[in-house]
């Protein structure tokens, strides 16, 4: 039977570091479960593993689409299933690491995404509307999905509306459970509120030092400021700075505030998942890593 280990939790909690530690211990690649890391060139702002980290540990399911491509949870599940099958044939477990709840749930036996193909004409009509107007429309048509999607996430807002308007039913009502043909261990990496805020602030400044602002300038010049991905968390705030609507200090503060809000929504999502085993991060990184290895070894031996 297939065996899948999931490492999940809010942004900046330390999932990636733990995932790499487990990958090295198990001798398997990290299968990323991040809805923005799938896109090429969106690197620093998505906290994509660096080249050095990718040399140390193989990462799959990153850089699989261009920023102008349509990519959704159904396509992600297709790619993830192929990687899981490949690892199973090699007698190895799959290690999924990320904070995109929909991606993780679709792969781990939760949601079966509705098979609604893209509608270019409908997308063109939606693209000319203001993002806040689209979000308000989604709140009316599908309040459950709207509650799970950030108001700045244009890609997911447009997709949810596309499904609603194409089928006449809310996206949230069309998801169904898929049958499990594997065993699953889900490990949650959380953090206390103050510690998480501190990590978010530190990570934001590290990203700026690593060249995030230059990345945004490059992407805006190459694809134009209206590229939907440039309206997502962090890229939108730095775009406002480049347009001289905020100074840099205000842009960074807004990134921290919005990231905290996003992390809170992620925690709400993952806390509602019944099968997640939460690790005690307050015991320190070394203890956390040892706890995770012990749980994984028991799971694989079972």
UniProtKB/Swiss-Prot annotation:
| UniProtKB keywords | ATP-binding, Magnesium, Nucleotide-binding, Transferase, tRNA processing
Which residues are substrate-binding? 11-16
Cite the GO molecular-function annotations of the record: ATP binding; tRNA dimethylallyltransferase activity
Show which residues form the site (Interaction with substrate tRNA).
Answer: 100
Cofactor annotation? Mg(2+)
Write down the chemical reaction(s) this protein catalyses. adenosine(37) in tRNA + dimethylallyl diphosphate = N(6)-dimethylallyladenosine(37) in tRNA + diphosphate
Establish whether keyword Repressor is in the entry: no
Q: EC number(s) on record? A: 2.5.1.75
Q: Subunit comment for this entry?
A: Monomer.
Q: Which family does it belong to?
A: Belongs to the IPP transferase family.
NCBIfam families to which the protein is assigned, alphabetical: miaA
Q: What does this protein do?
A: Catalyzes the transfer of a dimethylallyl group onto the adenine at position 37 in tRNAs that read codons beginning with uridine, leading to the formation of N6-(dimethylallyl)adenosine (i(6)A).
What the entry lists under HAMAP family is as follows:
IPP_trans (MF_00185)
Name assigned to this protein: tRNA dimethylallyltransferase
Organism from which the protein derives? Gloeobacter violaceus (strain ATCC 29082 / PCC 7421)
Q: What is the lineage of its organism?
A: Bacteria, Bacillati, Cyanobacteriota, Cyanophyceae, Gloeobacterales
What's the name of its gene? miaA
